[in-house]
Amino acid sequence: MAFTQIQYEKVYATRIIRFNRPEARNCIGPVTHRELIEAWTDFRDDADAKVAVITGAGDKAFSAGGDLKAGAELLPNDPDEIAAHNRGERPGVLGPSRWTDIYKPIIAAVNGVAYAGGLEWACFADIRIAEEHASFGVTCRRWNIGLADGGTQRLPRIIGMGRAMELIITGRVIDAEEAHRIGLVNEIVPSGTSLARALELAEFISTLPQPALRTDKEAAVRGYGRPLEEGLRIEAECFNRSIFDSATIEGLRQFRERDHPDRRTDGAPRTPGIVRS
């Protein structure tokens, strides 16, 4: 795959998808849109790919959103295309941002501004790691351009309706500290280190058994916002799909026989991220 406006890099079981237009604050145009679809399709379908990390080239921008100079080239512009877009049959305006069926983990390494469609792409991820100089905002509010790549749906799910509506309606830009305080960002790291931290986390996630991890993500994504009874039905369906997997049988064996690094030291399971005194 030869790309000109993104970079697609394989690092063991991790795939880095990088917006690569630093001279234009990594904004997304028609070529970027097509290349993003190709890269995300490869990640989704590649059995060896376990985690994706999305980031931006340079040190100024994750992505400033859509390339407004491209104008109508990014948009559905005839009745059939508009109807297909309304039915959810188009992948998104700025790449496959409307896809909801990637159940492999996705980490955003936010290395600068994440504005408008860039914010929407940050929300596409499951985990967001932001550099201390990063900022976030629905800056397209000034130009009378709406959110079309999941922002109106994902942002409220991440930070709650009240906070999301303030950002969506006003277009106010927030810094990394506020983003962390309201739950938009999971972790803040020094400038220039978000990709390294994301790769460290991706490497750890890649060591975990994958089947139940993915069905748990699927259950959370599909069940969110539904009535509790329906969400529990989805959870049961996903659980029953993974519980008899060979990885589960092996995991139970390792637990019973203490044949795992987390079961060999003091007899108690070790919880990642918790330091024992």
Task: Enumerate the predicted regions with their spans.
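Conserved CoA-thioester-binding segment of acyl-CoA-metabolizing enzymes
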Residues: 1-62, 72-74, 277
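Acidic-histidine catalytic/liganding microenvironments
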Residues: 3, 46, 65, 103, ...
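Terminal peptide-recognition signature
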Residues: 17, 21, 36, 54, ...
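An acidic, glycine-rich surface segment that forms the CoA-thioester-binding/catalytic face
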Residues: 33-37, 41, 45, 68-111, ...
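Conserved hydrophobic/aromatic "anchor" residues
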Residues: 40, 62, 136, 255, ...
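Short, active-site-adjacent cap segments at secondary-structure transitions
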Residues: 59-63, 69, 115, 137, ...
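Crotonase-fold acyl-CoA enzyme core
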Residues: 97-213
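C-terminal long alpha-helix characteristic of the crotonase
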Residues: 129-134, 185-237, 241, 246, ...
